[in-house]
C-alpha cells in the first residue's frame, strides 16, 4: 500500500478534472407496484451474520402472519435445518430474477451493496437495508446512512436487529414510502458523454 503524503496538493491539482456523472444503474428496472405479500430477504450466503438475521426473521415473521418471507440461505446451513419452510418463512439457496421480483413484492430486506441499492432506488422498491460494516464493506454502512434521511429506504443497524419489527411496520404502513430518488441515475450516459468530449 502506498501512503500519499501530499493529499491536499493532489486534490487541488485534479479537482478541476473531476466531473460528477451520477449513479449507474439498469434503466430497464420497472417501477414498483405491489402485487403480492412477499418479503424477500437477500442477505448473502456463507456468512456468520446471515444466521443472526435468519434467527431474527423467524421472530419477526410471527409478528407479521400475513406476510410471506422468502430468505436465501447457503446450502451448508440449509442441510442442518429440518425443513425449508418454517411457518411463513421459506428458505432457499437462490431467488431467481430477484430484481424482477422486487417490482411486485411487499418489501425487500437486503445488505447495502451498490448494485442492490441502485436497483432499489431505480425501481423505488420499499426496502430495508442492513448494511455490513466489517472488513471492506464499510462503504455499505456509509452509503446507507447517507441516504437514510432521504427516506428512499429504511436502515436497520446490524447490531440492533431487535428493532427490525418496528422498522418493517413503519415501512409497510407508510403510504408515502419510499420517496422518489431525486439525484441523477444517468451515470452511464453522462460518463460516455464526458469521455467523448475528452477524446474528441
Predicted features, each with a name:
Residues 123-169:
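Nucleotide-sugar donor-binding patch of glycosyltransferase catalytic domains
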Amino acid at each position: 500500500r502506498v501512503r500519499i503524503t501530499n493529499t491536499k496538493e493532489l486534490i487541488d491539482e485534479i479537482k478541476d478534472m473531476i466531473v460528477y456523472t451520477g449513479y449507474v444503474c439498469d434503466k430497464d428496472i420497472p417501477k414498483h407496484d405491489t402485487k403480492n405479500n412477499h418479503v424477500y430477504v437477500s442477505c448473502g450466503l456463507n456468512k456468520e451474520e446471515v444466521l443472526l438475521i435468519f434467527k431474527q426473521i423467524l421472530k419477526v415473521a410471527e409478528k407479521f402472519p400475513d406476510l410471506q418471507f422468502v430468505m436465501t440461505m447457503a446450502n451448508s446451513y440449509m442441510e442442518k435445518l429440518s425443513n425449508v419452510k418454517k411457518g411463513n418463512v421459506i428458505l432457499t439457496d437462490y431467488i431467481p430474477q430477484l430484481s424482477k421480483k422486487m417490482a411486485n413484492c411487499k418489501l425487500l430486506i437486503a445488505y447495502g451493496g451498490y448494485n442492490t441499492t441502485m436497483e432499489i432506488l431505480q425501481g423505488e422498491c420499499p426496502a430495508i437495508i442492513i448494511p455490513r460494516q466489517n472488513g471492506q464493506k464499510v462503504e455499505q454502512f456509509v452509503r446507507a446512512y447517507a441516504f437514510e434521511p432521504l427516506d428512499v429506504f429504511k436502515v436497520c443497524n446490524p447490531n440492533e436487529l431487535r428493532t427490525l419489527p418496528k422498522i418493517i411496520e413503519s415501512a409497510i404502513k407508510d403510504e408515502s414510502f419510499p420517496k422518489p430518488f431525486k439525484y441523477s441515475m444517468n451515470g452511464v450516459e453522462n460518463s460516455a458523454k464526458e469521455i467523448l468530449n475528452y477524446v474528441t
